Amino acid sequence: SRRQRQMCIRDRDQTSKLSKRNGDASFEDIVAKGYLPEAVVNFIALLGWAPKGEEEIFSLEELVENFDISGISKSPAIFDPVKLKAVNAAHIRRMTPEVFLEHVTPYIRQTVKRQDIDLPLLASVLQPRTELFNDVPEMVDFIDKLPEYDITMYCHKKMKTNEETSLKALKAVLPVLEKLEDWNTESIHKALFGLIAELEVKNGWLLWPVRTAVSGKQFTPGGGVELCDILGKEDALARIRRGIEKLS
């Protein structure tokens, strides 16, 4: 005879059952927010089932292979949106670069219209930092146009930077990058870290101002080196010059 088990799923506050009647999200609603269908299935499986080993991230095929009814819990399952996002991020990390590029490109193109952008390069920077595809358009919205930003963004306690030190850093960086003939992540990294060694300063003292100048954002999908490469030499240098103007 076939046995059936039904799980009760509660919201994170543990006070009420999830219900479409109460406006709780369906599978389709969650996927529409940028979650991968296989990540949602993985998360739902973990709500009331404990795998035998330490691994919690499974493809659909791996779930079929590993699922055992003996691992199902009798206790009500808790719907934790933080855990859902973590599971989704883990599935994104598992993607091959080619598959991730295919998935992420439409989200990039919502805000990045420039045709000179190296999409595989941008995708390689985004993949380890993306938790949710719907976050991507805002993550890359500085690429087409440098947003207006306040110079207080150059102040970073941990990096020990302020407006004065950032101006010094950008003035030191500009001629070094201007001289670069080969413009790529490796050459930019070598040039900037060579300058860091020459000036005998901490990495962040130099790199935080560069990242701020080229992005105009507090949080970016990558550091100053990667962003300079993505933007291209002409645009990156123009943004650094703009940073110098703002700080002067």
Give residue spans per PLM region.
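Single conserved hydrophobic/aromatic residue that forms the stacking wall/gate
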Residues: S1-I9
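Structural motif
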Residues: I30-E38, K74-D80, K113-L122, A197-W205
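Small-residue-rich helix-loop
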Residues: P97-L199
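Charged substrate- and nucleic-acid-binding regions of tRNA-handling and nucleotidyl-transfer enzymes
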Residues: T185-L247
